[in-house]
């Protein structure tokens, strides 16, 4: 039976903008020069970044969020905090201990998620979310969608950016540009305004914090400096509240709930509610009946948390955003008095205490004109509109979040591209050999701000061979660093005599292999086909129910054996889709005569 709502196979020219968030994700597209938020299939403007991997289906969004309590081992949330990260990273190691689902180390040291014995990369979890957003966009546009702009925290390193691009590829998206979240928010804020001068974008989301200082002038968005913390956000606030409640219950009842996965999941759900409640109220109540059972006696958790009490609990977390803001101002060569506007991005910025801290940092009231949950996706869509030629008179000049350089003699880190350098970028520096008659040189590339190379993130190396054997210091070795607008890097080295270049396109060691990506793409297609089959079956079941509710005089025109099969479908029995679609078509024809 043909589907009247089927998509056109012809891809559209639209480039969708996606905010792949830690807590929620959002998709937007430019229509008539303006960014429009696209609702998902549930009619929501944002989609919870939660994925439930069950026996016979994968759920994403609100459907999945409800499974956190019933299927905590199968339900993955905040996977963005793990993307492009190593399990042995101290931050990651500490964080995963509090997760209800299992994690494991992949063969390259990456942290992966384990569900029912099967391993999933964080990029693959992200791809499940992106696939849902892609389907929502295709339904809205009535076209297949291929190209996208995806945002990342400004302080994401190269590995995390590449892993995000991998997630897009697994979801069937061509990620034409990766842009920083604060920059995207600035685009959404400044495009339809005559805003000029220096602005600060304070972005405190579910898992990350970014601060960016930009200069706006006549459609030019020039990022002057950026700073942040990729492991600071609403998840940390929730965990502080959970710890407070667990400790309080221990003191009152002598029972440690910290070892009970289901109890912790219920408390975390309440912690999120408390956080939201206290953004608009001065008190929030927690009531969790039957939180545990001791000696046959059911225990209940019930207490109130006031706003002042809550602010004391989360104070140290929020105050961690102050120092990055000061550093960003210093790197931009500005004082707080030079900032004309402060934009708030991320759900956490709805908290009165956060707004109070922001006002103290910059000395002005932050702007609340834009929706902090939607601004980033709108900005990404605008960047997509610029790339597609749908939005004119906008120039975006972003910066590199971290320095890039090479290791010198003695393990010293020599920065070639310093952090907050405007990209695209190209820089060449001259180096030489450290020994007489040296014919080979290993050029090791690192990313970071530490003085010694070993303390920074290793990205790869170039082996330059056949250097003319000369006294040390005589050969001239040219090392060139290039960065494209996506913040992806290429390093080229050559000696001045042979002029034979050796280059390294930096594909992060923590990225997925081509084989792994291809496998995940195939699995994604299989799930997509399964989802499509379920959707069609649901539509047929509804059509059968509507048909069987018709009057007797109509239905008696149809063959009884066909009606009998349709009644089985209506009773919830399994059925062959193609056969039932044909029966439905035949019965409709019969009764219309």
From Swiss-Prot:
CDD domains: ASKHA_NBD_HSP70_DnaK-like. Belongs to the heat shock protein 70 family. Gene3D superfamilies: 3.30.420.40, Actin, Chain A, domain 4 (3.90.640.10), Substrate Binding Domain Of DNAk, Chain A, domain 1 (2.60.34.10). This is Mitochondrial-type heat shock protein 70. It is found in: Nucleus. May act as a chaperone. Keywords: ATP-binding, Chaperone, Nucleotide-binding, Nucleus. It holds the Pfam family HSP70. It comes from the Eukaryota. InterPro entries: ATPase_NBD, Heat_shock_70_CS, HSP70_peptide-bd_sf, Hsp_70_fam. The keyword ATP-binding applies. The keyword Nucleotide-binding applies. One of its GO terms (cellular component) is nucleus. GO terms for molecular function: ATP binding; ATP-dependent protein folding chaperone. It comes from Encephalitozoon hellem (Microsporidian parasite).
């Amino acid at each position: 039976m043909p589907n009247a709502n089927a998509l056109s196979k012809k891809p559209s020219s639209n480039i969708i903008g996606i905010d792949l968030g830690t807590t929620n994700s959002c998709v937007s597209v430019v229509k008539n020069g303006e960014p429009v938020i696209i609702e998902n299939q549930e009619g929501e403007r944002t989609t919870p970044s939660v994925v439930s991997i069950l026996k016979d289906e994968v759920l994403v969004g609100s459907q999945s969020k409800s499974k956190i309590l019933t299927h905590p081992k199968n339900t993955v949330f905040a996977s963005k905090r793990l993307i492009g990260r190593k399990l042995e990273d101290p931050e990651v190691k500490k964080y995963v201990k509090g997760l209800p689902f299992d994690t494991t180390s992949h063969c390259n040291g990456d942290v992966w998620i384990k569900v029912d014995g099967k391993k999933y990369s964080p990029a693959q979890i992200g791809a499940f979310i992106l696939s849902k957003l892609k389907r929502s966009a295709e339904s809205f546009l009535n076209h297949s969608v291929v190209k996208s702009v995806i945002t990342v925290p400004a302080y994401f390193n190269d590995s995390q950016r590449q892993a995000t691009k991998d997630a897009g590829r697994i979801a069937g998206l061509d990620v034409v540009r990766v842009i920083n979240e604060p920059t995207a928010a600035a685009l959404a804020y400044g495009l339809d305004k005559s805003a000029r001068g220096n602005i600060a974008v304070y972005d405190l989301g579910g898992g990350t914090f970014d601060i960016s200082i930009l200069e706006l002038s006549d459609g030019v968005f020039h990022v002057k400096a950026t700073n942040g913390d990729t492991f600071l956000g609403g998840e940390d606030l929730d965990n502080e509240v959970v710890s407070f409640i667990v400790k309080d219950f221990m003191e009152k009842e002598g029972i440690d709930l910290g070892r009970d996965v289901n109890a912790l999941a219920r408390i975390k759900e309440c912690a999120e509610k408390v956080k939201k409640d206290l953004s608009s109220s001065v008190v929030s109540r927690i009531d969790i009946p039957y939180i545990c059972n001791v000696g046959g006696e059911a225990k209940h958790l019930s207490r109130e948390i006031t706003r002042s009490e809550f602010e004391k609990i989360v104070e140290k977390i929020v105050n961690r955003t102050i120092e990055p803001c000061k550093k960003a101002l210093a790197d931009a060569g500005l004082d707080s008095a030079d900032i004309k506007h402060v934009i708030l991005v991320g759900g956490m910025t709805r908290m009165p205490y956060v707004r109070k801290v922001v006002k103290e940092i910059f000395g002005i009231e932050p702007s609340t004109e834009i929706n902090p949950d939607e601004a980033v996706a709108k900005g990404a869509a605008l960047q997509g509109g610029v790339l597609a030629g749908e939005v004119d008179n906008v120039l975006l000049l972003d910066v590199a979040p971290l320095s890039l350089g090479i290791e010198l003699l003695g393990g010293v880190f020599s920065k070639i591209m310093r952090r907050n350098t405007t990209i695209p970028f190209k820089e060449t520096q001259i180096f030489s050999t450290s020994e007489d008659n040296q014919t080979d040189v290993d050029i090791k590339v690192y990313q970071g701000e530490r003085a010694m190379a070993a303390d920074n993130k290793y990205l790869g190396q170039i082996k330059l061979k056949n250097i003319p054997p000369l006294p040390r210091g005589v050969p001239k070795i040219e090392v060139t660093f290039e960065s494209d607008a996506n913040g992806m890097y290429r390093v080229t080295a050559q000696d001045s005599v042979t002029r034979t270049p050796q280059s390294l396109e930096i594909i992060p060691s923590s990225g997925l292999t081509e084989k792994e990506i291809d496998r995940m793409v195939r699995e994604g297609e299989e799930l997509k086909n399964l989802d499509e089959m379920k959707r069609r079956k649901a539509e047929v079941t509804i059509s059968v129910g509507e048909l069987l509710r018709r009057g007797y005089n109509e239905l008696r025109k149809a063959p009884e054996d066909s009606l009998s099969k349709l009644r089985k479908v209506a009773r919830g029995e399994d059925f062959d889709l193609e056969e039932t679609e044909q029966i439905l078509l035949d019965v409709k024809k019969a009764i219309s005569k």
